[in-house]
Amino acid sequence: MTAISDRDPKDRRNVMASIHHQIFIAANPDAIWNAARDVGRLHDRLVPGFVTATEMLPGDGAPVRRVTFVNGRVVDETIVSIDDAARRIVWAIKEFEHHNGALTVAAAAGGAQVTWIADLLPDALSEQVSPAMAHGLAMMKAHFEGSR
């Protein structure tokens, strides 16, 4: 499911996009969560084929990872929160005017329900970000279900 403002683009100048994607993965939710919370290993534990490299950057304060996607795009993400009890990780992409991403992993009959949410500005970026999120979840599913 994707939820993006349905207003005319010219009326969305000051509207923050809120993108929601969910996918069922027939795998142990703890295994998915353990890979997701390993924030420096996206490329080999969570979404190989979608992310090609993850590097933890040195510094004080919140952890920052540099993520290289298969299309060559590189972004720096600040890890805001890792909540093991809720199986929820939150991060922000530094180069956006505003970005708050969250991934949750919930137990479901026969596997896990994974939800990826992003709130972002400028709103126009949703046209690029939403399909990328859907593709990332599909790659995650393929990885954990062994159907790559």
Ranges and model annotations:
Residues 21-23, 77-81, 100-107:
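Hydrophobic/aromatic beta-strand elements that line small-molecule binding cavities or substrate pockets
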Residues 34-41, 84, 134-138, 142-146:
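Short, intrinsically disordered, mixed-charge
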Residues 20, 27, 60, 84-86, ...:
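Residue-level signal for tight coil/turn positions that link beta-strands
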Residues 40-44, 51-97, 113, 120, ...:
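Glycine-rich portal/gate segments that line the openings of hydrophobic small-molecule binding cavities
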